[in-house]
Amino acid sequence: VSSTENLALPTGYQLQDYEIRKVLSSGGFSFVYLACDKDKNTVAIKEYLPISIALRADNATVQPNADDVALFRRGLKCFFDEGLSLAKIDHKNIVRVLNFFRANETVYMVMQYERGKSLQEYILGQQSLVSEQFIRRVFGELSNGLREVHTQKLLHLDIKPANIYIRLDGSPVLLDFGSARQALSENLAKFSPSYTPGFASPEQYYDRKLLGPWSDIYSIGATMYACLTRTSPPAANQRIKNDLLVPAVKLGKDHYSQSLLEIIDSCLSLDYLERPQSVFSLQKALLESKPLPKKKSSLVNKIVLALNKPILIKKTPAQKAAITHTNTI
C-alpha cells in the first residue's frame, strides 16, 4: 500500500462529537489530528492506521489488505487496550487521554492538547549548556508520571527529546505513546517494533522478551545524555558491536556533578541488569544527589556548545505540534 493512498480525514470532517481541524502529524501506525469538541475545546485525536498494511476507502473507513487482516486486528486490539490503560492514568506528567472510541472500522484516542515546546526545541534553543538543575527537575517530575505508566503494565518504548513536552509553566509531560504496547504480553513481538536509534534500548533490537521498566530507563538516560551533548548517543545495536559511546562522566566532568553523570552512565548500560531496575530508584537518585553550584557561562562553555552542534536532533513542523508521532528526532 502506498502511503499516498492513506488520505487523512479532511478538515471539517465530523468524527462523532469532534470536528477535524487539521493533521498534526503522521507516522507508521497513525494519524494525529487537531480537532475541537462540541464545546469548542481543542483536543488532539490519534487514529489507528498502520500505513504498511491498510488504506482508507472513499467512505473514510479503514481497510486492511486482504493478507494482513489478522495483523491489522492484532494491532487494533493493542491500540485499543493501550487507550483503555492510558485512560486510567490521570497524571499531570502524562498526556491525558480524554476519550477513545471505534469508528470507520478503526480506533480513535482523544487526548488533551498541550501548549509549549518539545524538550528537543528547548535544548536547541539554549545559548548555554542545559543546567543540571533543569535536568534533575524535569526528569525527576517526569519519573512520577512514568511510574504510573509502568503500574498499568505499559511501557512507553519511544522516550526521546521530541516526545517530552515542556509546558508554558515549565512542567514536563510525556507524549506520543505510539510505541507503547501491552509490553508484558507475548503477542507484542509479532507486531512491527517502532523505535528511535540512539534512544532505544538493546532489548528493543535483540530480545523483546527482556523488555521492562529498565528499557524506558535506558531511553531516559539517552535523553539526559542528549541534554548534555545536543546529539543522540550511538545506537544500541552499534554499541554492542563496537561501543564508541563517550561516557557522561568524561564528557561533562567540568560542567555537571559526578553523581548526575554517573546516573546517566548507569542508565545507558548495555546490560539491563546494570541499569536502575525501577523508575522509583532512578528518581530517588536524581532527587537525592546534590548538583554543582551554578557557574556563569564561560568561553569553555561556548566552545563546548560550538563543538556539539545538533546532528541527529532536527526540528520538523510535526514536532512543533503538541502531540507528535514520528520516528525521527
What would you call each of these model-derived segments?
Residues 104-118, 122:
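Conserved short submotifs of the Hanks-type protein kinase catalytic core
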